[in-house]
Amino acid sequence: MPVSFVTLPVELVYRILDYQSDITIIFSMRNVCQRFNAIVESYDRYQTITTLNLRWYEIRGIGTQHLANVLRNNTTLTTLNLGLNKIGDVGAQHLADVLRTNTTLTALNLFYNQIGDVGAHHLTDVLRTNTILTTLNLDRNEIGAAGAQHIADGLQNNTTLATLNLKRNQIGDVGVQHLADALRTNMALTTLSLGWNGIGNIGALYLADVLRNNTTLTILNLERNRIEDVGVQHLADALRTNTTLMTLNLGLNVIGNVGAHHLADVLRTNTTLTTLNLENNHIEAVGGQHLADALRNNTHTTKLYIVVAHCLEWDVF
């Protein structure tokens, strides 16, 4: 008597699943038929899959659609890595559609996926309605200033996203202005990465204005931008009243001895900042001395990273 797939004993199907990877189970063994869905959902390993790493699988937009269909009924996955998959704006839309109602995913990595401002717009809807997602990585996409505005709109009233990575997205000073406006009302974000975005002194001013009164942001990454001594002065002024920022990364900017002096002045009285990164700027020995003198009286800043110009080594004070 021939054996039909739909009549295979459940235990035999379980044994077949034992030899499949998590990715195969999720992508290829869901939505085959209603009975098989029920069996997969009752399978022990499927019920305990909390992390899925699909980095560099080239799933693109169509693959993201299949994944989104799975996520509609999944109640276990908390961390999803889709880095380097070229999902684009279409893929971002598929994810956004399902994340509006998903109640388990807390961390989403979309690193290097060719997502533009349209895709960022789709993700804005997620930030407005999703109350579970705490970490979003959009590093090395193409959202630009317009996309940053969309993300900022979603952040206005978001109460759960704590970590946002927007490095290498060409958002510039205009994009920073939108994000700074959002930080005036957002009370959830604690970590913001804005490195490699072409941010200059004006962008530093926008951030400084909001940092004066912001009470939630603890980590701010501004590495590899175009911030000069004037921009650092704005940030230093903000640090005189800010009581929450603990880590500030200003490495690979255009900060010289004057900027180092501004930071040294505020380090004498700031009691919150514990880590300051000034690696690979234009700070010479005199600027380094200003910082060293300030730290003699500061018992709170425990890590200062600085490369003195024209020297090969870097020091941690």
Regions found by a protein language model. Give the residues of each.
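N-terminal Skp1-binding subsegment of the F-box domain
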Residues: 1-28
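Leucine-rich repeat
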Residues: 1-3, 13, 37, 61-69, ...
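Short helix-loop-helix/strand-helix junction enriched in hydrophobic and basic residues
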Residues: 10, 24-43
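LRR N-terminal entry segment and analogous cap-like coil->beta motifs
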Residues: 39-66, 73-78
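Conserved hydrophobic beta-strand positions in leucine-rich repeat
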Residues: 50-54, 80-82, 108-110, 136-138, ...
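Conserved "Asn-ladder"/turn position within leucine-rich repeats
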Residues: 57, 85, 113, 141, ...
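Leucine-rich solenoid repeat scaffolds
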Residues: 276-283, 287-317
